[in-house]
């Protein structure tokens, strides 16, 4: 009976150790994914800002071609 208790204890202990190792690796992977997401958001913000500037500049040029100016004349 004591042998079974020790064996069961050993199996449970090893299971918990392997589970904690897997959780730790999972957290590290999630942290790496978060860093990648932040980089993607940063690049998207830069592209979005450049697009807004490009559209604003294009609208000004179109307004000049049509004959409208900022003074409303």
Curated annotation (Swiss-Prot):
The keyword Cytoplasm does not apply. One of its GO terms (cellular component) is extracellular region. InterPro entries: Antimicrobial15, Frog_antimicrobial_propeptide, FSAP. Coiled coil: none annotated. Pfam families: Antimicrobial15, FSAP_sig_propep. The keyword Secreted applies. Residues 1-22 form the signal peptide. It is found in: Secreted. One of its GO terms (biological process) is symbiont-mediated hemolysis of host erythrocyte. Its main location: secreted. Residues 23-39 form a propeptide. It comes from the Eukaryota. Keywords: Amphibian defense peptide, Antibiotic, Antimicrobial, Cleavage on pair of basic residues, Secreted, Signal. Expressed by the skin glands. Has antibacterial activity against Gram-negative bacterium E.coli ATCC 25922 (MIC=120 uM) but not against S.pneumoniae ATCC 700603, S.choleraesuis ATCC 14028 or against Gram-positive bacterium S.aureus ATCC 29313. Shows no hemolytic activity and no cytotoxicity. Belongs to the frog skin active peptide (FSAP) family. Ocellatin subfamily. This is Ocellatin-PT6. It comes from Leptodactylus pustulatus (Ceara white-lipped frog). The lineage of its organism: Eukaryota, Metazoa, Chordata, Craniata, Vertebrata.
